[in-house]
């Protein structure tokens, strides 16, 4: 049967709280965070771990994590040894691409039940020592930050931070510092309110940590409550002396994981499961690496063409706030009102664990649609290298 007759559905979703850099989740490696999200998603799906055929998890900073991070996460979650596992790296789109791969594998009939998501511990990314293998011989060496080199710097213009491209985007669209800061303040207020009011309780799987001799459960996102709203307008530009992009109107360095359980609708019906969302379609858009910031515009356009939807027919959007200007550009180009976009806050507030965010925004989108009794949602995010992914969902 084809996609229309027997579509791919999501039967459960879970994420960890988003931990601040060197914060409450610093004691967890990426596979441990992934294991927590997978375990929660499988339990919420009310299926046996043995029913999971495949696990696909995004992870952008694998150095020092050991072999096959997705395999570690799956086994750590209690899945059986027979479960196939794959780790993928598509930069910030890794977690969403994992779900896209899962969708297509299920559609092809290669698997019946797949867990897909992403994980990242930016806190635990190691430092790298180039040339050490051959021998430095004499003189000064160099130490590279794995997080910066493989996560936050452009691969084509070596050493150039991604934030400088956000500056170019701000200039192109004439987004003022004030406009970016106002967007960020709104994101923070939404994220703080969502956490305080328990709006994320449906999606978050609490994490147990040790504080001294006591055990504590982390049940809320950490970063939104570290921000000082009054100081946002006083921060210095982070990437250019006369720039407008700051540490506040950029995403926060974070730790976290998210996971989804996907299967065909017929497989869900066979198990007596009620799907929480149907995957209507997905799209990838690629362009000039220097303009990764505007790639979601193209991904959304392609997604609308594939689904037959238009921008106004979508109830809610999650467009990742790698930088405020990324989301602002997509909103401007597609005419999206802010009251439909990132309604519970975005990465400027919650943080952006790069391998996890693509799955995290899908989980959060489903949660928001459920909360407000809405039906259609679209998630998208920019990807270093000039790409973007987008996914369309529909609730029952």
Residue ranges and their predicted role:
Residues 1-28, 40, 229-294, 298, ...:
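Condensing-enzyme catalytic core mediating Claisen C-C bond formation in acyl metabolism
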Residues 2-65, 69-77, 81-84, 168-177, ...:
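Conserved active-site "lid/cap" helical segment
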Residues 88-120, 170-199, 259-266, 331-332, ...:
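Active-site-proximal alpha-helical scaffold in enzymes
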Residues 165-167, 210, 280-349:
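Active-site pocket-lining segment
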């Amino acid at each position: 049967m084809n996609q229309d007759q027997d579509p791919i559905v999501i039967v459960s979703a879970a994420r960890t709280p988003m931990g601040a850099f060197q914060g409450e989740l610093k004691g967890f490696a990426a596979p441990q965070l992934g294991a927590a999200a997978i375990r929660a998603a499988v339990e919420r799906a009310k299926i046996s771990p043995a029913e999971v055929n495949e696990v696909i998890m995004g992870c952008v900073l694998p150095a020092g994590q050991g072999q096959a991070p997705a395999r570690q996460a799956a086994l750590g979650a209690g899945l059986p040894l027979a479960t196939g596992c794959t780790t993928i790296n598509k930069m910030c789109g890794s977690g969403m691409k994992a779900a896209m791969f899962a969708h297509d594998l299920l559609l092809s009939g290669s698997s019946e039940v797949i867990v897909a998501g992403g994980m990242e511990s930016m806190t635990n990314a190691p430092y790298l020592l180039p040339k050490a293998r051959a021998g430095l011989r004499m003189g000064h060496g160099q130490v590279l930050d794995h997080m910066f080199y493989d996560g936050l710097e452009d691969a084509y213009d070596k050493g150039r931070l991604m934030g400088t491209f956000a500056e170019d985007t701000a200039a192109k669209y004439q987004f003022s510092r004030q406009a970016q800061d106002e967007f960020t303040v709104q994101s923070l207020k939404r994220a703080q309110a969502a956490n305080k009011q328990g709006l994320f309780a449906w999606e978050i799987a609490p994490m147990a940590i040790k504080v001294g001799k006591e055990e504590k459960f982390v049940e809320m996102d950490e970063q939104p409550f570290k921000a000082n709203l009054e100081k946002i307008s006083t921060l210095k530009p982070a990437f250019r002396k006369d720039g407008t992009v700051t540490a506040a109107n950029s995403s926060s360095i974070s730790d976290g994981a998210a996971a989804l359980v996907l299967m065909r609708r017929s497989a869900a019906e066979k198990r007596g499961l009620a799907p929480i969302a149907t995957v209507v379609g997905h799209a990838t858009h690629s362009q000039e690496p220097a303009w990764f910031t505007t790639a979601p515009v193209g991904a959304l356009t392609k997604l609308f063409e594939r689904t037959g939807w238009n921008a106004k027919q979508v109830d809610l959007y999650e467009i990742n706030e790698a930088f405020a200007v990324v989301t602002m550009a997509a909103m401007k180009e597609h005419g999206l009102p802010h009251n439909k976009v990132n309604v519970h806050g975005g990465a400027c507030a919650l943080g952006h664990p790069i391998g996890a965010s693509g799955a995290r925004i899908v989980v959060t989108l489903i949660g928001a649609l459920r909360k407000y009794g809405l039906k259609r949602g679209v998630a998208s995010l920019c990807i270093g290298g000039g790409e973007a992914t987008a996914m369309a969902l529909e609730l029952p």
